[in-house]
Amino acid sequence: MNLLQTHLDGIRKTFPDLVSAATESAGGVLTIAQSREGSPSATQDGQWIHSAYDPRKEAQSWAALQTKEWHAGELGVVLGVGLLYHVEALVASKPVGARLAVVIADIAAFKDALAVRPLGPWFNAIEWIWGSSDEMATQLASKSAPLRFFTYAPA
């Protein structure tokens, strides 16, 4: 069984609608390339979305900067998934009492990430947001917590 199918099977019980959306998506919007340190990285339309050298280290440095102003009780919101390095790093460094939501603007990119990145328990610590722009805005508005937005610029 391939990594994508393993992930979809593993998250189906908790996130059945997300699995359906990913299954219906064609994927293939990210071009996967091996980074110099060996883990997968990716480009989209010729632009690196994570470091071509060490995507984990880059994500950890970025997350450390983001968490300086993130407080307990806030819902951190990440716009975009990339290969999820930045999401994983935020989960690892989020303040006690803070929550994290990830807005999946492009379900095809999410599917590509599931096909190449191993998931850990951190995946279930995230509130996943997807759908139309109106649906995503409604989902975020219903969270009843102060929102702190994080954006992850391409490498």
Language model region names:
Residues M1-A155:
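N-terminal donor/sugar-recognition subdomains of glycan-related enzymes
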